[in-house]
């Protein structure tokens, strides 16, 4: 294999990855579809109105639970990212021109779907002078404007930890500001060459200093050790991270990083307990957990924790 599906030549790392066949999933990696009344109603509405969510387009295994809670995730900034992470299925390339009407359309979709909580994520836009900071901030502002009772979780790139760009994003006051470190320092550069571990921690620290509830994610099965996971959790907590999700890496294609190991469910339980002992206000840990899984519930846990801390 020397040509990518979109017709370009493979990167050297993609060619190396492609020599490893797609791994067989263990029996505990299963999607259990439970279609409740809220999910059924929302699914019909999304289809009827022609709306687009990451939940459907990425085939998220948690769509049944999240939609039952009236929660959904939206991708902004286009479908081409200016950076390439070795686990991510979003294409890397030259993005289309900035669509300044997108924030309003997303907000209208949130209103049409009657969402209680919306997660907004997006691609890195290093081609723009502001890295897309206005787009992220304006999307939060429009959602709040059109949906006063809806919570918004904003999952952002690092904006190179530029204080002015981060301030622009933070000023939109999302209920939760998320930035995912995804993996441990030893393999970080290979997995996320466009990012830096310490810089990602700095983003979380700055968000916490701005008074926001903060969140991050760790993906397991890409070559890290158990000790490194524990240290990464401590690094996040010390950086000011309130909420943490821990998940299993599922390889999108042969061009992506091979799965190093399948983490057993009991290890996820142990890691969840360890994270709670470290002090995180809310933790979701499991093979099919994703960073936006039960996002509204985790946010409420963080608020309750802050209230309790204020009283003590």
Swiss-Prot record:
Keyword Disulfide bond: no
Keywords: 4Fe-4S, Cytoplasm, Iron, Iron-sulfur, Metal-binding, S-adenosyl-L-methionine, Transferase
Catalytic activity, EC: 2.8.1.8
Residues where [4Fe-4S] cluster 1 binds: 55, 60, 66, 292
GO molecular function: 4 iron, 4 sulfur cluster binding; lipoate synthase activity; metal ion binding
Pathway annotation: Protein modification; protein lipoylation via endogenous pathway; protein N(6)-(lipoyl)lysine from octanoyl-[acyl-carrier-protein]: step 2/2
Reactions performed catalytically: [[Fe-S] cluster scaffold protein carrying a second [4Fe-4S](2+) cluster] + N(6)-octanoyl-L-lysyl-[protein] + 2 oxidized [2Fe-2S]-[ferredoxin] + 2 S-adenosyl-L-methionine + 4 H(+) = [[Fe-S] cluster scaffold protein] + N(6)-[(R)-dihydrolipoyl]-L-lysyl-[protein] + 4 Fe(3+) + 2 hydrogen sulfide + 2 5'-deoxyadenosine + 2 L-methionine + 2 reduced [2Fe-2S]-[ferredoxin]
Chief site of localization: cytoplasm
Residue span(s) of domain Radical SAM core: 67-281
Stored Pfam families: Radical_SAM
Cofactor(s) the protein requires to work: [4Fe-4S] cluster
Cellular localization per UniProt: Cytoplasm
Any one of the GO CC terms: cytoplasm
Keyword Ligase attributed: no
Residues engaged in binding [4Fe-4S] cluster 2: 81, 85, 88
Enzyme class: transferase
SUPFAM superfamilies membership: Radical SAM enzymes
SMART domains cross-referenced by the UniProt entry: Elp3 (SM00729)
Cofactor detail note: Binds 2 [4Fe-4S] clusters per subunit. One cluster is coordinated with 3 cysteines and an exchangeable S-adenosyl-L-methionine.
UniProt record similarity statement: Belongs to the radical SAM superfamily. Lipoyl synthase family.
Identification of the protein by name: Lipoyl synthase
Organismal lineage: Bacteria, Bacillati, Actinomycetota, Actinomycetes, Streptosporangiales
């Amino acid at each position: 294999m020397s040509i990518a599906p979109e017709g370009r030549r493979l990167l050297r790392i993609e060619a190396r990855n492609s020599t490893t066949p797609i791994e067989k999933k263990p029996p505990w990696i299963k999607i259990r579809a439970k279609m409740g009344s809220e999910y059924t109603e929302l699914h019909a509405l999304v289809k009827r109105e022609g709306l687009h969510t990451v939940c459907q387009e990425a085939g998220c295994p948690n769509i049944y639970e999240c939609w039952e809670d009236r929660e959904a995730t939206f991708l902004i900034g286009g479908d081409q990212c200016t950076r390439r992470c070795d686990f991510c299925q979003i294409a890397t390339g030259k993005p289309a021109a900035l669509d300044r009407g997108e924030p309003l359309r997303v907000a209208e979709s949130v209103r049409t779907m009657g969402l209680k909580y919306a997660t907004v994520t997006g691609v890195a836009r290093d081609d723009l002078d502001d890295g897309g900071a206005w787009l992220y901030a304006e999307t939060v502002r429009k959602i709040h404007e059109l949906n006063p009772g809806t919570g918004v979780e904003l999952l952002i790139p690092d904006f190179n930890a530029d204080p002015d760009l981060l301030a622009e994003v933070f000023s939109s006051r999302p209920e939760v500001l998320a930035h995912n470190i995804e993996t441990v320092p030893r393999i970080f550069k290979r997995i996320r060459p466009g990012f830096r571990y310490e810089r990602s921690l700095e983003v979380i620290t700055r968000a916490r200093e701005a008074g926001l509830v903060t969140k991050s994610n760790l993906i397991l099965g890409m070559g890290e050790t158990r000790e490194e996971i524990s240290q990464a959790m401590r690094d996040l907590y010390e950086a000011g991270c309130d909420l943490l999700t821990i998940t299993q890496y599922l390889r999108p294609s042969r061009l992506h990083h091979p799965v190093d190991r399948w983490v057993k469910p009991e290890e996820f339980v142990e890691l969840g307990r360890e994270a709670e002992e470290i002090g995180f206000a809310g933790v979701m840990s499991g093979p099919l957990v994703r960073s936006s899984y039960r996002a509204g519930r985790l946010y409420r846990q963080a608020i309750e924790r802050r209230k309790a801390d204020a009283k003590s």
